[in-house]
């Protein structure tokens, strides 16, 4: 077929009413051997880059470091590590460590992945339980 034939074919297809278009699709699926249910079951939705749960596959770049708990016998080393990783003084670092429950290391502060991993390792080596979110 030449391009002129393709152009006229496109015009003819576009002029079909909904019933005729559905019939055309069904016959094309049969002729080409597509599975029952059509192409929509085999082809991902437009926008494609999606992961489970519908979240975008875009890689996250900003992370929070969440301090969860610490080993009681490592309290002093954990306080020192918290002071190293933040600008907190001794009293504030001690209060932070002793406060119950999971909390961000620095409220609202986001870190690059490498920096967050480094902080996590430093705190875990000191005896803290830390996660990155």
From Swiss-Prot:
Which biological process, per GO, is one annotated for this protein? translation
What domain of life does the UniProt record list for this protein's source? Bacteria
Question: Which GO-annotated molecular functions does the record name?
Answer: mRNA binding; structural constituent of ribosome
Arranged from A to Z, the UniProt key words for this protein are: Ribonucleoprotein, Ribosomal protein
The signal peptide annotation in the UniProt record is none
One GO cellular component this record assigns the protein to is: ribonucleoprotein complex
The protein's matches in CDD domains, at most eight in alphabetical order, are given as: Ribosomal_L7_L12
Q: Which InterPro entries match?
A: Ribosomal_bL12 (IPR000206), Ribosomal_bL12_C (IPR013823), Ribosomal_bL12_C/ClpS-like (IPR014719), Ribosomal_bL12_oligo_N_sf (IPR036235)
The answer to keyword Membrane applying to this record is no
- Cited Pfam families: Ribosomal_L12 (PF00542)
Cystine connections: none
Q: What does this chain do?
A: Forms part of the ribosomal stalk which helps the ribosome interact with GTP-bound translation factors. Is thus essential for accurate translation.
Hey, which family's this protein in? Belongs to the bacterial ribosomal protein bL12 family.
**Quaternary arrangement and interactors, per the entry?**
Homodimer. Part of the ribosomal stalk of the 50S ribosomal subunit. Forms a multimeric L10(L12)X complex, where L10 forms an elongated spine to which 2 to 4 L12 dimers bind in a sequential fashion. Binds GTP-bound translation factors.
Q: What is the protein name for this chain?
A: Large ribosomal subunit protein bL12
Origin species: Ehrlichia chaffeensis (strain ATCC CRL-10679 / Arkansas)
Organism lineage reads as: Bacteria, Pseudomonadati, Pseudomonadota, Alphaproteobacteria, Rickettsiales
